[in-house]
Amino acid sequence: AGGLEAFEQFFRSLAPDSGMAFVLVPHLDPSHASILTEILQRSTAMPVIEAQDQVAVAPNCVYVIPPNRNMAIFHGALQLSVPDVPRGQRMPIDAFLRSLAEDQGDNAIAIILSGTGTDGTKNEKEKKPLPICGR
C-alpha cells in the first residue's frame, strides 16, 4: 500500500531514458506470487522485470526482487539466493545495499521510499556508505 504508492509515484516522475538502472527490494510475502512487476509496469515505459540470477543490470530497466529470495550484485550482475534465516530475521535491503556499495561504489545511490523497522538503515553505519535519500 504505502510502498506501492511510493514506487508508482517515483516511476511516474522519471524519464524512461535516464540511463540509470533501478533495483527494488521490497519486503514481499514469500508464500504468494508477486504481481508487483505488472503493477509497476503501468507507471513507467521502462521494462519492469522480476530479477533473475546472474542477469547483468542494464540501464533504463527496473528489476524487482522475487519473493523469498536474497539478492546481491557482483560485477554488475544480480545474484539471487534462497534465504537461510527465518523471514522476521532477514535484512534483504541492508544486504543488497552492502553489495551495491562494494560492487558499484560511487556509481550507486540508494533511495529508501517507505517502510517500517530497521532494514535499510545499517548501510548508514558502514565504512563506505551509499548516499541515501528519501528517509
Where in this protein do the model-derived segments appear?
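Conserved acid/base catalytic micro-environments in cytosolic active-site loops
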Residues: 1-135
